[in-house]
């Protein structure tokens, strides 16, 4: 398998107050970059505050000093901060589009990709398929056009029904990628979604048809891979084999352990994944 950049989910200190779905590394840009490399990773998947996206200079300096990378900007903080790209209220949609575009601009400074997952929202109560489709078409096309100009790439992330009612499978995400037809609008994978929303993990990975170049790597238990092997629900060896067959390349991001020694677990996960993906 081609080399994959391993990253840690990372954000600023106040992230800890948001009760996010998974636990992430928090700290200053310098702390994030330094710890990620020290713990065995190539860099970070950064989750900025969508309402106060930082200037890129400080993070750029920190990454360079640590020898780290930041290939992906995660927009997941939009959800707990009350934003949704697909929302019944026009004011919320405008606020959300503005926030997402700020993160696209931020990513463009690094030549990075931008995940579009829970940022689209849980779905609109009472909205029919045609209404959701019209709204999504407008939003996705506008964002793709914006990303092209910003020299960034948006990655549509399917999510399980517990997170959103709209775009749950890789097949659905790929239909949108084909429909939008922009080089700045692609797809990404997530192992939790693959386990919860696909006919099989293999089906989900292959449905991306080699177009995905980023994957979230964690067990449905929300633990990082290889830390609690007796409790893992995923067959990581099988997953790695399918990724290899699909010639997956790019980057993969890992969460922190939800409890216990975060550093020890992160180091163990990095060692496990490097052995697994080198196979």
State what each model feature region is.
Residues 1-40, 167-189, 195-279:
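Histidine-acidic metal/acid-base catalytic patches
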Residues 10-14, 48-50, 76-79, 120-122, ...:
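Active-site-proximal loop/turn and secondary-structure-junction residues that shape catalytic pockets
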Residues 22-26, 85-186, 196:
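Active-site acidic/histidine proton-transfer and metal-coordination neighborhood
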Residues 45, 72-74, 115-116, 155, ...:
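Conserved beta-strand positions in the central sheet of alpha/beta enzyme cores
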Residues 55-56, 82-83, 126-127, 166, ...:
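Short Asp/Glu-rich motifs
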């Amino acid at each position: 398998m081609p080399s994959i950049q391993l990253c840690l989910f990372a954000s600023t200190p106040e992230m800890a107050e948001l009760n996010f779905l998974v636990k992430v590394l928090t700290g200053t840009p310098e702390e994030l970059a330094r710890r990620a490399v020290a713990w065995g990773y190539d860099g970070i998947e950064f989750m900025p505050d969508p309402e106060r996206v930082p200037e890129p200079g400080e993070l750029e300096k920190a990454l360079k000093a640590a020898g780290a990378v930041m290939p992906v900007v995660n927009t997941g903080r939009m959800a707990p901060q009350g934003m949704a790209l697909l929302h019944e209220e026009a004011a919320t949609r405008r606020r959300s589009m503005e926030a997402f575009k700020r993160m696209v601009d931020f990513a463009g400074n690094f030549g990075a990709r931008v995940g579009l997952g829970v940022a689209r929202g849980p779905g609109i109560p009472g909205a029919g398929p045609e209404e959701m489709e019209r709204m999504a078409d407008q939003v996705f096309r506008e964002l793709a056009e914006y990303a092209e100009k910003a020299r960034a790439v948006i990655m549509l992330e399917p999510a399980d029904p517990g997170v959103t009612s709209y775009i749950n499978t890789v097949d659905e995400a790929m239909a949108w990628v084909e429909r939008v037809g922009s080089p700045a609008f692609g797809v990404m994978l997530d192992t939790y979604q693959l386990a919860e929303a696909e006919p099989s993990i293999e089906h989900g990975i292959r449905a991306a048809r080699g177009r995905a170049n980023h994957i979230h790597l964690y067990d449905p238990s929300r633990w990082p891979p290889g830390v609690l092997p007796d409790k893992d629900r995923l067959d990581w060896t099988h997953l790695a084999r399918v990724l290899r067959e699909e010639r997956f390349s790019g980057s993969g991001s890992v969460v922190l352990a939800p409890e216990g020694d975060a550093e020890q677990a992160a180091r163990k996960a990095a060692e496990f994944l490097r052995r697994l993906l080198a196979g």
